[in-house]
Amino acid sequence: MQIFVKTLTGKTITLEVEPSDTIENVKAKIQDKEGIPPDQQRLIFAGKQLEDGRTLSDYNIQKESTLHLVLRLRGG
């Protein structure tokens, strides 16, 4: 299924995923497309931050859902 990931810059990334994919998997796919290390990615859906060990179906994320990607920058 396809889902969309919207970044803070307003860019939308399209990903091909399965409902059984973990959030960790999704972050890896984002890394493949965008080169952003998973440890800097925070994914938000329906106002909730998604945890790495959970699956898309755990959060009831279905086809054509839009997740929001927030970058956690190190340091500071």
From Swiss-Prot:
A Pfam family: ubiquitin
Protein localization: Cytoplasm; Nucleus
Keyword Transmembrane helix recorded: no
Keywords: Cytoplasm, Isopeptide bond, Nucleus, Ubl conjugation
Cross-link (Glycyl lysine isopeptide (Gly-Lys) (interchain with K-? in acceptor proteins)): G76
InterPro entries: Ubiquitin-like_dom (IPR000626), Ubiquitin-like_domsf (IPR029071), Ubiquitin_CS (IPR019954), Ubiquitin_dom (IPR019956), Ubiquitin_ubiquitin-like (IPR050158)
Chief localization: cytoplasm
Site (Interacts with activating enzyme): R54, R72
Chain positions of cross-link Glycyl lysine isopeptide (Lys-Gly) (interchain with G-Cter in ubiquitin): K6, K11, K27, K29, K33, K48, K63
Site (described: Essential for function): H68
Biological role: Ubiquitin Exists either covalently attached to another protein, or free (unanchored). When covalently bound, it is conjugated to target proteins via an isopeptide bond either as a monomer (monoubiquitin), a polymer linked via different Lys residues of the ubiquitin (polyubiquitin chains) or a linear polymer linked via the initiator Met of the ubiquitin (linear polyubiquitin chains).
Membership in a protein family: Belongs to the ubiquitin family.
Name recorded for this polypeptide: Ubiquitin
Organism for this UniProt entry: Oryctolagus cuniculus (Rabbit)
Highest classification ranks of the organism: Eukaryota, Metazoa, Chordata, Craniata, Vertebrata
